[in-house]
Regions:
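Long, low-complexity, intrinsically disordered N-terminal extensions of eukaryotic proteins, enriched
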Residues: 34, 54, 61, 108-110, ...
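Short E/K-rich amphipathic alpha-helical oligomerization segments
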Residues: 15-41
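Amphipathic alpha-helical coiled-coil segments
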Residues: 24, 40-66
Length: 416
């Protein structure tokens, strides 16, 4: 059945705005003129503001349409057994690369709400799996008699089989299966023992498995329509301990006046410049001005990513690839880098002194064509503009993720 006219109109308007935003981002990436950059950023900020407004209106319209469609739904289990099981997916796209870092309490794959409307206590077992890709996630709960304690919500995140997801190089369809069973007990000489299992719900839900080299920026919660930010997990793609990264760091040291990179025991700017010069002169990397890609009408935003060692071996990088490579080299040099994510783009930052909260920025796509100072100026202007935009109420317009914080506060470790 086609979507309602209002919804279609909003989607079309959003589609056109996204195309306009994409064109502006391409112009922003291509310009190295500070004055032209400021004008383009101002226009881009206005377009992003309109996009945010349309997205909010569209989400509210879609939720209203969905509520109307659900008005006459009847849950059979609550009428027949007094037990209601509501299964809800929390993400339609499974980010296989960083899935092992997710927490079921904050980023579950699905949730199951159990409601006991009878006067008896109930014991219920919930099992969920991604068919062919995960182990079973099993949770058993006790539901109190009807009342406030008779409702429980279970959050599930089945563990993926590594050997099953490693071959995933393309977006792949999969099925999530959820089984809700009541454990029926009998008594014998004051002892309880299980006599049967009664199936309360058996649900199959379609999902998408993201490719292993796809880094998630955000996923849409199918229930609320809200975007769940996952950009912090870009930190997993910062891999300072890889042999290829360490070997290139030794080359970078050769570009430093003291022939070594000593972290915060030495001048920070000269070390960042040495890494910049090494990438410019020794890596032979072609920097591609491609955008962080997503479709706002889909349920995931992300970007295919080359790991730092792949950038060095393939001699190619886009904005996020170059950012992750530069951040890996900075972290390997015992400095404190950060990944900066703004609409359609990413660049690198580093802390001027340890734990100071004062940052320098650099546009990595300019490494092959411009000087260190020019790349710093453009990176700084972009950071200043988008940080001000974010201060207006939309935090997604400027995300600065210090790698030290990601490692220590979020437990996000390198993928390799």
């Amino acid at each position: 059945m086609p979507a309602p006219t209002d919804t279609i109109s909003l989607r079309q308007e959003l589609y056109d705005l996204r195309l306009q935003a994409g064109r502006l981002q391409q112009e922003i990436l291509a310009t190295t003129d500070p004055d032209a950059l400021d004008a383009l950023l101002t226009t881009a900020g206005e377009v992003e503001g309109r996009i945010a407004t349309i997205e909010t209106t569209l989400r509210q319209t879609e939720q209203a349409d969905g509520a109307t469609a659900r008005k006459h739904a009847v849950t059979r289990s609550s009428k027949t057994t007094g037990l209601d099981a509501n299964v809800r997916l929390r993400m339609m796209h499974v980010p296989t690369a960083i899935y092992h870092l997710l927490d079921a309490n904050t980023d579950p794959l699905l949730e199951v709400e159990l409601v006991n409307s009878k006067s008896d206590e109930r014991r219920v077992r919930v099992t969920a799996r991604i068919e062919g890709y995960s182990a079973d996630a099993v949770t058993t709960v006790e539901l109190e008699r009807r009342g406030g304690a008779a409702t429980q919500t279970i959050y599930l995140l089945p563990t993926l089989f590594p050997q099953a997801v490693i071959p995933l190089h393309e977006l792949t369809r999969a099925t999530v299966t959820v089984l809700v069973e009541e454990l029926i007990f009998a008594s014998d000489n004051n002892k309880q023992f299980s006599t049967a299992l009664r199936i309360e719900a058996h649900v199959s839900l379609p999902v998408w498995m993201l490719a292993r080299n796809s880094a998630p920026l955000a996923v849409r919660d199918p229930q609320s329509g809200e975007w769940v930010d996952l950009s912090r997990y870009f930190g997993a793609f910062v891999t300072p301990n890889q042999p290829e990264v360490m070997a290139f760091l030794r080359k970078a040291a050769g570009h430093h006046p003291q022939q070594r990179l000593a972290g915060y025991q030495s001048d920070v700017a000269s070390q960042a410049r040495a890494i910049f010069d090494a990438l410019k002169e020794d890596a032979d990397i072609t920097y591609v001005n491609s955008l962080i890609a997503f479709n706002p009408d889909e349920s995931a935003r992300g970007q295919r990513v080359r790991l730092p060692r792949e950038c060095l071996s393939e001699h190619q990088a886009n904005c996020i690839d170059g950012t992750l490579l530069f951040a890996s080299l900075l972290e390997a040099a015992s400095l404190h880098p950060a990944i900066v994510v703004v609409p359609g783009h990413a660049f690198v930052a580093w802390e001027r002194s340890p734990d100071s909260g004062r940052w320098e920025y650099l546009e990595t796509t300019m490494i092959g064509t411009n000087t260190f100072a020019e790349a710093q100026e453009i990176g700084g202007r972009k950071a200043e503009f988008w940080e001000k935009q974010a201060a207006g109420g939309d935090a997604s317009k400027f995300r600065r993720w210090p790698i030290k914080e990601l490692r220590t506060a979020y437990g996000i470790t390198p993928l390799e």
